[in-house]
Amino acid sequence: MKTFVLVSCLLVFTQIIYAVDIKELKIMNRILEKCIRTVPKGENDPINPLKNVNVLYCAFSKRGIFTPKGVNTKQYINYCEKTIINPADIKQCKKLISKCIKKVYDRPGPIIERSKNLLSCVLKKGVLELTVYGKKK
């Protein structure tokens, strides 16, 4: 019985560890560091640079999620799987991002403005807090 419990715990632990895409996180961390350094700081910017729409726009643009034609919807929604451990949170992330995409991209306006409005919507819905970036203390 003890062996069964131990093996079960190890399987769950392994699943949790490999649920996020470590390679992608390393790439994104490097990009975020560059964007945090290069994006001009405004007086109304949040203290946490990961909640700064301009920093996130910079990072996601470098990853090809935001393009001159708009958002790569599939890639953005799938990003939930790369940065979230809990399956319920992944589902919630995808749902919230989909709602924000529909809300923002159904309105007219310049692509960059709509992309930044999308990030603003996603931040307000609490998607960052679902990711490993929101879990960091």
Swiss-Prot record:
Protein name from the UniProt record: Venom allergen 4
Record bears the keyword Secreted: yes
Quaternary structure and interacting proteins, as annotated: Monomer.
Tissue: Expressed by the venom gland.
Alphabetical UniProt keywords: Allergen, Secreted, Signal
Documented effect of changing residue 28 to V: In Sol g 4.02
Outcome reported for the amino acid change (mutating residue 123 to R): In Sol g 4.02
Principal subcellular localisation of the protein: secreted
Family: Belongs to the ant venom allergen 2/4 family.
Gene3D superfamilies the record matches: 1.10.238.190
Subcellular location: Secreted
Signal peptide bounds: 1-19
UniProt cross-references to InterPro entries, sorted A to Z: Ant_venon_allerg_soli_2/4_sf (IPR038211), PBP_GOBP_sf (IPR036728), Sol_i_2/4 (IPR055216)
One annotated Gene Ontology cellular component of this protein: extracellular region
Molecular function GO labels: odorant binding
Keyword check for Signal: yes
